[in-house]
Amino acid sequence: MEILEIRTLRGPNYWSGYWKKLIIMRLDIGAYEQKPTNKIRGFYGRMKKVMPGLYEHGCSYGERGGFLKRVKEGTWAGHVIEHFALELQTLAGMDVGYGRTRQTDEEGIYNVVFAYMEEEVGRYVARAAVKHFLELAEGKDIEKIEESITSEVQEMREIREDVRFGPSTGSIVEEAEKRGIPFIRLNDYSLVQLGYGVNQQRIQATTTDKTNMIAVDLAGDKDATKKTLGDMGVPVPKGYR
């Protein structure tokens, strides 16, 4: 099994009209294309033991225990990994609840799609979900898998604390979400775009783009200026980053 690509979506997209923040993992499941979960000896029982919260996943049945039924009947690795990624985020306090897995035109290659709250956490959990599927499928020690999950959940919580907005910016973004206004985080700090296209507005902490302050700050930061121009399609030197 091999992760071919992990992409991060931050706005309107092909996969969902509602969910804007999505991870798209292109995954080659290799030999597991011929081994659905009902053909992997002991997988169902081991999975239930290490992630009991999967019982809450309704999946296509639309009821509690629905996903477990799918696993027992036989489903493919990409679908299971999608649910692992969602459950691990839930354990870390980031309940997003949206996922899709679709086969591509190439045999054994799937697009595993799931929502995230924090981009860095989303990319981290994609790799963790693949790792745990392989550990369970290969019959690795249950206690070690449980210890690994506990450690990863704590790591995700710490990542979120490191990258989450401060109180002021967070309050503005939360209110924007309540009003149905999409947002994109533009850097690792507090520069945020609210809305899209001609209707977009930008804030930095509690400062709006109605003042010159954001422009002055960006112009005084060479790396931030380079990134902003590069994101707009203006050719810039790569520099040291």
Predicted regions, residues:
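Long, compositionally biased, glycine/small-hydrophobic-enriched stretches that function as flexible linkers
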Residues: 1-152, 159
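Conserved N-proximal alpha/beta basic substrate-recognition cap immediately N-terminal to
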Residues: 114-241
